[in-house]
């Protein structure tokens, strides 16, 4: 398993697509103007559990899971934990 420091040191590379923005807003029931900023703040939270599985980083905090592609740093989705 790779160190979460890799993701944290590349935090400025985080981005998402228009479809990703809509998906994240819908899944988390949020109405923020800047979804990437919202996700960055969650990932940088000291309580965030960050781990890598296969090609994705998973960031768990405040009962949500944010999925980030480990190669492109694209925020793929975010959803509440079940």
How should each PLM-predicted stretch be described?
Residues 1-82:
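Ribonuclease/tRNase effector modules and their secretory precursors
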